[in-house]
Design a protein with these regions (language model features):
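Alpha-helical scaffold segments in soluble metabolic enzymes
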Residues: 35, 39-43, 206, 247-251
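Stable alpha-helical structural segments in soluble proteins, enriched in small hydrophobic residues
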Residues: 174, 178, 245-252
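C-terminal non-catalytic interaction/assembly regions of soluble proteins
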Residues: 188-247, 254-257, 263-267
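N-terminal basic/disordered segments at the start of proteins
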Residues: 260, 265-280
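Generic structural signal for short, solvent-exposed loop/turn connectors between secondary structure elements
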Residues: 2-6, 250-257
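Aromatic-enriched hydrophobic runs in primary sequence
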Residues: 1, 150, 177, 207, ...
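Conserved mixed alpha/beta catalytic, RNA-binding, or beta-rich assembly cores of soluble enzyme
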Residues: 2-77, 81-199, 272-278
Length: 280
């Protein structure tokens, strides 16, 4: 496999024939090869094994945006921009850091922390910055000038209700339309939730397989005990035993309901968001 063929190349390590060196060869940060090399060397410390880490930011002891993204479960949206930011850091430049979530830990000296306020916060200035948000619009204006790297948290849950036999494309259209109405990125979806009567619904399963996200299902009893104000339907209650599926499923997953029931072509969706923080 050529590295360019995969957005997230796998971690590749090489151990020399004497067992002296464990070399992180490919995907040191995103693939975790650097960490794995250190772990293996630690296990073989009594044999004198030494980890060999060659990524520039590690050699210089600088902040690494791709390692930071990996540790926080964030999606890198632009690898070229990530390279530009890493190169700038190695040259001693300061990078602006906008984050829509609480920040824990000490912010590295290479970053200038700003509270994200969209365009009003200067995202259209010609400067390099890292932006953490699940919103689509935040990167759009900034991308026109300078280098704005958006890191996407996977913190969105979509609750789904549908007729039996609904195909994947109809599921996708309904989910996409709802997320776009909220200016949310599809890449931010952490999972899909529904009632257990839908646990074998092929359209939903196919959508989840494509997105590589979990499909969480709950019994009518589990959904019924959820607290909140939900859009009730007598018809849905007769069929499923609970007055609402999509909204209650979101809440059952542990997410806060962000947008209530929306119907499109026989598919109902609701959108929720997990609370999270960013850790340095």
């Amino acid at each position: 496999m050529q590295p360019s063929e995969s957005m997230y190349p796998p971690a590749i390590l090489v151990i020399d024939e004497t067992g002296r060196f464990c070399i992180s060869l490919l995907s040191g940060h995103l693939g975790g090869a650097n960490t794995l090399a250190e772990e293996i060397s630690g296990l073989m410390a009594d044999k004198g094994m030494i980890p060999v880490i060659t990524t520039a930011t590690d050699r210089e002891g600088c902040f690494s945006v791709d390692e930071f993204a990996r540790r926080n479960g964030l999606v890198l949206t632009d690898f070229q921009c990530a390279k530009e930011i890493s190169a700038a850091i190695l040259q001693g430049e300061k990078i602006f850091f906008d984050c829509s979530y609480p920040v824990e830990g000490e912010v590295p000296e290479e970053l200038i922390l700003e509270k994200s306020r969209g365009k009003e916060n200067g995202l259209e200035r010609e400067e390099k910055r890292i932006l953490i948000s699940d919103r689509v619009y935040t990167a759009a204006g900034a991308a026109k000038k300078g280098c704005c790297l958006q890191l996407l948290p996977k913190n969105i849950v979509v609750g789904i209700g549908c007729r039996k036999g609904t195909d994947k494309e109809m599921i996708r259209q309904a989910v996409t339309a709802h997320l776009h109405s909220l200016c949310l990125s599809e890449e931010a979806i952490a999972g899909v939730a529904s009632i257990d009567l839908k646990q074998e619904e092929e359209g939903i399963l196919a959508f989840c397989r494509e997105k590589q996200i979990p499909f969480m299902t709950y019994s009518a009893k589990q959904l019924q005990i959820q607290m909140g104000s939900f859009t009730a339907s007598d018809f849905v209650e007769k069929v499923t035993g609970v007055d609402n599926v999509c909204e209650r499923s979101v809440v059952a997953s542990g997410a806060a309901l962000l947008s209530g029931k929306r119907a499109e072509n026989g598919v109902t969706t609701a959108v929720g968001e997990y609370q999270r923080s960013i850790v340095f």
